[in-house]
Amino acid sequence: MWGAPFSAQSRKLLLLGSGELGKEVIIEAQRLGVETVAVDRYSNAPAMGVAHRSHVIDMLDAESLKALIRLEKPDVIVPEIEAIATQALVELEEEGFVVIPTARAARLTMDREGIRRLAAEELGLPTADYRFADSLEELRQAVSELGTPCVVKPIMSSSGKGQSVCRKPEDAEDCWNQALDGARAKGTRVIVEAFVTFESEITLLTVRSVEGTIFCPPIGHIQKDGDYVESWQPHNMSASQLAEAQFIAKAVTDELGGLGIFGVELFLTDQGVLFSEVSPRPHDTGMVTMATQDLSQFALHVRSILGFPVQSVNLLTPGASATLKAIGNGQAFAITGLGEALSLPRTQVRVFGKPEVRPGRRMAITLSAAENVENARTTAKQAASMLKVEVYEDEQ
């Protein structure tokens, strides 16, 4: 039990990273009477609009991060992004602060190398063949060993930034430059993956609570340039594929430990299920659960990290999501077409409230429910096509 926000008996959640996923986490926490603090590197981030208060700091600056957390003294520290000084989280955890799911999990998943080595080399789980490279010369060697096409990604990036397909050896320099441009924290290390021919990509939302591990129905998704553009639930897959996916997801999340929801990304191939990545937090493709499940991924995350039981997840209806992305740049913009999109049956729109636009930035999603996935996908994409981000040259 705990008291109201701002009281001596309040429970406090501090969010590191305040994007659209964090916004929904804050909303769910407030429904349970939790005091909320949103933190990000820029002002007016989406979650800051709904949190009780907010702070703007460089989250890669360990001293600034530690000073803020010691000042706020939260009951739980909830990372929403990878670009955080994770060694500081390790130190704070040693001081007695609770990091979700654990400081070790945050450190391992902050970049693609840590989690890939854990999954493939320590746990022996099936993955695409891969190499790491610290220079253009090493990248060319990796491309030679893996063959083309292959996929080049920065060790640390989000939403597909810096990711490219190397289709011939001569593309290596362009891929290297794209990776450097898209990397977070000025990283210069990349992972090179053998190209995987897959039937589909899925996210298996895996919930670790005080009562054990449960799985949400699988979510299918399509990515473009490494970033998701639509997702749907449930994804149709065989019982054997689902069992294999759940085995992989449980192995990875058990090793990471802690409480909360994990977005485990997997490839379904004719050779079996391959592990791709894991995020120890709600997943962008999982926003569809706001339309499909009795408890969304955000509600599940908050319940589990606060120590409440999570006994089951029920799929209420098939559903789908589709994204709205910006084309231009600027702070003076408007999203149009909301009335048209909301006129479609069983359809919702979530406008994230980001303070500025840039090409490819995700600004909103549509959510549609229907009697089957195919109809839900059609409606969600139709609704998204009705929305536009209009950028103005001058403040309107």
Where are these regions (language model features)?
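Short acidic-glycine loop/turn motifs at beta-strand connectors
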Residues: 208-212, 224, 268-271, 370-372
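Active-site "cap" helix and flanking loop/linker of ATP-utilizing ligase/carboxylase catalytic domains
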Residues: 243-264, 269-270, 279-331
